[in-house]
């Protein structure tokens, strides 16, 4: 009697139909446009699909084949990654709604809009689930590419991986460095340069140590006879430090026996991604901060994951930890929020070895932290630094309050108005609130507000949270929608000196005409690169933030020891982004996530191989 196989029987047909429907949702999700083009539901859907039938058909077939293959090739291991895929699918839909501040999108405006949202949610959840399962399988199986042992370049890499990789990256950056002459900076650095020149007093809103270093660069320029040369020397020093850290990171990944594909891909990203090759030429406090965070991750990987004999007590380890911590604490005001949790987790990691081991582990990071506080105090005294605004620390609650005031202005009792007005200018909040950046709201912070006023304000903040939690959630989500969005291009470029006319004339900073022309061609080349497949993803904070969550889930499920310490830098960076002022066109806040995730992935690879052995 002929038997009906599971693949060709009724259940096989049902499974195949579901697989095809899911593949169609995945394909449609990639091309979904949430703009409502017509009030007619059929026309609205037709406008979204029109002209895309061929790519939709191709992607549907490809996804259907992948899904059928994944059923046997990539088994599900627990529910963690599935839940994460669903959450990321929902986040993707909301991110597409909130990612653009220039167009208003309503998901519930019509039945067709709601259908678009459902299709996109189902499709992206399935796409994320497929990607997560594939990555999970690659990590657990130890899938890698094999490279031949011969060749002069291969032998040089084995002998000097840090030197070779650092030199290669620096060579790739050379065109960007030349075109950036004499200097490129953002508005924050321009303000620091004006402080270093003495045009305005030093203030604590920007790290005073970084301002002092910029002053040294200007002093070097005076010695060399040109401010251009002094500022360009700073750029060169930053590029050399960056290449050295990246080379060292590649050597660390090799020590962890990271797969070839991970090392090669991360090196390519370091060489050609804007967060590296473009920003390494920019005087930007986030660049030395992120490079220092990368160096700290290297040291944590070698001491905690690789556990090289005697390395944790070596002088080289202590020096590199000190350089990393000082770089994080002196160039960014929030560096302490990363170093302290890392020190705490490091101490807890060795708690079974006794209190001496705990003190020794903590001292690696806490001693440089104390030294940085002494240095900052000295700089503050030497340059008479004006205290920064305390309101800088409350970006998120201020933003939530502003949205609540805009939404419920007439319903707020007089007593609550007065309490808010003691901290922020209540009457201005409704008009100046910008859902994507908290700076306009923070500018109304009253400098004379003390602890008493802030305590009363947070009491009102808590009451309003209970009154309309959705309002607070919207304020948080809109401002941080891009944090887990791998599709939207959210990259800022700083190509010009950015100085005020007064500062530029005083310094004599100028850019040759030929470099302006080359910069124009460089901008055209960027557009070409962003048109390449996967380039946007590999250069976006959202992609690496999602990868961070995947690594967290897998490490937790597999009980990979030491990963909590390794993930401190990217996780705390993500927390600070949520609490921070803005992410739109400010990808620099996420640089530590991009810089450190390849190392975290290499560490997880090492721990999974150790468990398997």
Q: Where on the chain are the PLM-derived regions?
A:
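Transmembrane-helix motifs of polytopic, lipid-linked glycan transferases
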Residues: 126, 236-257
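Membrane-proximal stem/loop segments at transmembrane-domain junctions that anchor or position
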Residues: 385-513
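Specific aromatic-rich, kink-prone transmembrane helix
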Residues: 126, 130, 197, 289-308, ...
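Transmembrane-helix signature of polytopic, membrane-embedded enzymes
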Residues: 76-82, 162-164, 249-272, 291
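Membrane-interface anchor segments at the N-terminal boundary of transmembrane helices
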Residues: 41-58, 229-233, 478-567
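Extracytoplasmic catalytic/substrate-binding loops of multi-pass membrane glycan-assembly enzymes
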Residues: 180-192, 201-217, 225-229, 592
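Transmembrane signal-anchor helices characteristic of membrane glycosylation enzymes that use polyprenol
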Residues: 18-34, 85-98, 158-185, 368-381
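Membrane-interface alpha helices of multi-pass inner-membrane proteins
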Residues: 317-332, 343-344, 368
């Amino acid at each position: 009697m002929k038997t009906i196989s599971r693949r060709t029987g009724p259940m096989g047909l049902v499974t195949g139909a579901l697989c095809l429907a899911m593949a169609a949702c995945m394909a449609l999700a990639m091309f979904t446009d949430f703009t409502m083009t017509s009030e007619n539901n059929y026309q609205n859907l037709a406008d979204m699909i029109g002209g895309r039938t061929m790519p939709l058909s191709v992607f549907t077939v490809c996804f259907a084949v992948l899904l059928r293959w994944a059923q046997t090739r990539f088994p599900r291991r627990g529910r963690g990654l599935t839940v994460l895929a669903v959450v990321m699918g929902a986040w993707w839909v909301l991110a597409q709604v909130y990612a653009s501040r220039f167009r208003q999108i309503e998901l519930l405006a019509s039945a067709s809009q709601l259908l678009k949202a459902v299709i996109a949610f189902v499709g992206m959840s399935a796409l994320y689930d497929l990607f997560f399962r594939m990555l999970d399988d690659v990590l657990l199986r130890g899938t890698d590419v094999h490279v031949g042992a011969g060749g002069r370049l291969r032998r040089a890499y084995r002998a000097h991986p840090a030197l070779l990789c650092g030199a290669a990256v620096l060579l790739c950056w050379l065109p960007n460095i030349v075109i950036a002459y004499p200097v490129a900076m953002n508005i924050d650095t321009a303000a620091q340069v004006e402080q270093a020149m003495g045009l305005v007093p030093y203030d604590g809103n920007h790290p005073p140590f970084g301002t002092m270093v910029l002053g040294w660069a200007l002093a070097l320029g005076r010695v060399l006879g040109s401010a251009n040369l002094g500022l360009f020397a700073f750029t060169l020093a930053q590029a050399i430090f960056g290449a050295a850290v990246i080379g060292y990171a590649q050597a660390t990944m090799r020590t962890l026996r990271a797969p070839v594909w991970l090392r090669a891909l991360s090196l390519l990203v370091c060489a050609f991604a804007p967060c590296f090759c473009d920003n390494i030429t920019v005087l930007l406090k986030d660049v030395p901060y992120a490079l220092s965070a990368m160096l700290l991750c290297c040291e944590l990987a070698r001491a905690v994951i690789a556990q090289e004999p005697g390395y944790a007590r070596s002088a080289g380890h202590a020096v590199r930890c000190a350089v990393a911590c000082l770089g994080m604490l002196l160039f960014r005001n929030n560096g302490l929020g990363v170093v302290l949790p890392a020190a705490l987790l490091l101490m807890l990691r060795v708690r079974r070895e006794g209190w001496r081991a705990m003190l020794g582990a903590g001292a690696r990071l806490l001693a440089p932290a104390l030294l940085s506080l002494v240095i900052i105090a000295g700089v503050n005294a030497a340059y008479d630094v004006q205290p920064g605004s305390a309101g800088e620390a409350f970006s998120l609650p201020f933003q939530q309050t502003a949205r609540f005031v805009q939404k419920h202005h007439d319903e707020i009792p007089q007593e609550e108005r007065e309490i808010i007005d003691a901290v922020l200018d209540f009457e201005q909040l409704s008009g100046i609130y910008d859902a994507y950046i908290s700076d306009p709201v923070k500018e109304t912070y009253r400098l004379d507000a003390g602890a008493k006023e802030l305590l009363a304000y947070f009491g009102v903040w808590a009451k309003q949270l209970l009154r309309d939690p959705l309002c607070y959630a919207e304020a948080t989500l809109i401002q941080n929608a891009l944090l887990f969005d791998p599709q939207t291009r959210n990259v800022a470029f700083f190509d010009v000196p950015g100085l005020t006319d007064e500062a530029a004339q005083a310094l004599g900073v100028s850019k040759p005409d030929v470099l302006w022309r080359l910069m124009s061609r460089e901008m055209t080349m960027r557009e070409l690169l962003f048109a390449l497949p996967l380039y946007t993803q590999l250069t976006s904070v959202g992609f690496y933030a999602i990868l961070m969550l995947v690594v967290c889930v897998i490490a937790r499920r597999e009980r990979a020891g030491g990963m909590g310490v390794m993930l401190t830098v990217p996780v705390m960076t993500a927390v600070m982004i949520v609490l921070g002022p803005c992410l739109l066109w400010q990808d620099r806040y996420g640089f530590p996530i991009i810089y450190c995730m390849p190392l975290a992935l290499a560490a997880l690879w090492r721990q999974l191989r150790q468990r398997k052995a």
